[in-house]
Amino acid sequence: MAHATPPSALEQGGPIRVEHDRQRRQFSVRLNGCHDRAVLLYEYVGKRIVDLQHTEVPDAYRGRGIAKHLAKAALDFVVEEDLKAHLTCWYIQKYVKENPLPQYLERLQP
């Protein structure tokens, strides 16, 4: 008999929970139990500079605001750790334009 995966908070209409894996240098949201994930990847490109490189949300979950939660978590991490950020990812560039908070803008690298 197959075991059903318990529904994620997202599927139940609950809050979106972003996890930060510092070792893998990624932020993620579990979408379907432990199988599907939305991710935001970053790399350190200097001692205090991170490159926010790529955001990916599976097609079936797009349009639900998941990428916004990932972008906010990553930018809040930059602020909390007093880092600078280079924005390679087009989505994070768009997020900052739509949310031009001073604490984000002052940490951007060209």
From Swiss-Prot:
Signal peptide range in chain numbering: none
InterPro entries in alphabetical order: Acyl_CoA_acyltransferase, Gcn5-rel_NAT, GNAT_YJDJ
Transmembrane stretches, start-end: none
N-acetyltransferase domain mapped to chain residues: 19-109
Protein source organism: Mus musculus (Mouse)
PROSITE patterns linked: GNAT_YJDJ (PS51729)
Gene: Natd1
Expression across tissues: Expressed in the heart, testis, kidney and lung.
Family, per entry: Belongs to the NATD1 family.
Protein name, as recorded: Protein NATD1
